A protein has these predicted regions:
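Flexible loop/hinge segments at secondary-structure junctions
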Residues: 1-182
Length: 182
């Protein structure tokens, strides 16, 4: 927490920052004895070596689909509602906030999308476009999970799917719920 939570953190002097997975990987490879963080998918696809990270309970955990899934499931119990502030969630799951973080990779996060709760505030938005967006979100949370493992991502835990369903049902257009089929 010394540096806060942000997509871009102001690190102390003497540190290097790369742009995205390719930039970070290149800097680490060019600078002996350096470490960096890239997505597991990127590391696997590019044969980049990676190591274990110490968890809040002192356990050293290797990043695998199983340890990422364990972290996601444990963290899902402390997620705020979809229409509440997510500022406290941070960039990575905070396994310090969960009862049993054992077996969870400690620097894991969800990929996410931010959507207005009331879609008619978006210029040019129509009921048809709102419905298409909400149907896409529903697909991503359900049928789209089929593709996760093949891309070295973890399918959403059941608790997160349920959480996302409730959030998607909150989306409205002109005050009317869009996801009327769910």
């Amino acid at each position: 927490n010394n540096f806060g939570a942000s997509k871009v953190i102001s690190w102390p002097g003497g540190t290097l920052g790369g742009s995205g997975n390719p930039g970070v990987a290149a800097l680490v490879q060019q600078n002996q004895y350096s470490i960096g963080y890239v997505e597991l998918t990127y590391a696997l696809q590019n044969n980049i070596p990676y190591g274990k990270v110490q968890s809040p309970v002192g356990e050293f955990v290797e990043p695998t689909l199983e340890t990422l899934a364990t972290a996601a499931a444990a963290s899902s119990l402390s997620l705020p509602q979809g229409d509440q502030s997510w500022a406290s969630v941070g960039t990575y799951f905070n396994l310090h906030k969960v009862a049993d973080p054992r077996g969870g990779y400690p620097i894991t996060s969800f990929s996410h999308i931010i959507v207005y709760k009331e879609l008619n505030v978006i210029p040019g938005m129509t009921k048809e476009k709102a419905t298409a967006l909400v149907k896409f979100l529903w697909y991503a949370v359900h049928e789209g999970q089929f593709y996760a493992s093949g891309l070295s991502y973890v399918p959403l835990p059941k608790e997160v799917v349920t959480h996302n369903e409730a959030t998607i049902r909150m989306i409205t257009f002109n005050g009317q719920q869009v996801a009327t089929w769910s």
